[in-house]
Swiss-Prot record:
Domain Gnk2-homologous: 33-135, 141-252
Pfam families, alphabetized: Stress-antifung (PF01657)
Gene3D superfamilies linked to this entry: Gnk2 domain, C-X8-C-X2-C motif (3.30.430.20)
Organism: Arabidopsis thaliana
Gene that encodes it: CRRSP27
Name the record gives this protein: Putative cysteine-rich repeat secretory protein 27
Position of the signal peptide: 1-26
Amino acid sequence: MISKFGSVHILAVVAIQLLIIPSVSSLNLTNAYLHHKCNNTEGKYSHGSAFEKYINLALRAIDSDNYLNGFAYIERGEDPNKVFVMYQCRGDSYGSKCKSCISAAISGLRRRCPKSKGAVIWYDQCLFEISTINSFNKIDYENDFYLSNPNDVNDKELFNKETSALLEELTNKATDKNNMIGNKFVLYAAGDKRIGTKNVYAMVQCTKDLVTTTSAACFEWIFKMFSKCCEGKQGGRVLGTSCNFRYELYPFLRN
């Protein structure tokens, strides 16, 4: 798979494993590391500092969560050492599966971005972010990347048209104001569609701090990258910290 992060194009060797997963059951167990970014402009904290104290308080709050909502946005501390921590799990990953992914993400981020005040990491089933900036209900236009299958489909024109239509249909469902659990917007939808001789499986998701209007704007933004990452490809995804989409020719979600 070819990966793009920011304005840099690289070959993401780790993403090759996404092409060779042999079964739905193994897909359900996959939690591959995808990407990370250390936001150096936010600086670093020192051992024993107030910022480290507040990060640890935020992480303890996350650790005590039941992960049933699959999302949390936590604020700890006071200026100038205020910490904002967010996690979100994929729409089919919650409870113990969500917790397992977030634990891996926290460990991975600490290893890859030691003592960074701002950093984000993506795994196959979750994302985790630490920041000094309050981004609640705000779209992050800075941090995104894409992964695509190197193999092409046969009828590219038909495939692009119908896959785009499926993603648009799922977006409308995800951003429907009636798509709620309790008093919270779901902002997630998944489905499949027969295109020619193939079944296409897809999902769209936004972080649950967004409202439906903000999430619709986020989806519109990432769908503009479809032509760069995915046209004519057998699989592809665009991931940001605020929203993402994915489609494949095989099932990749739990029922």
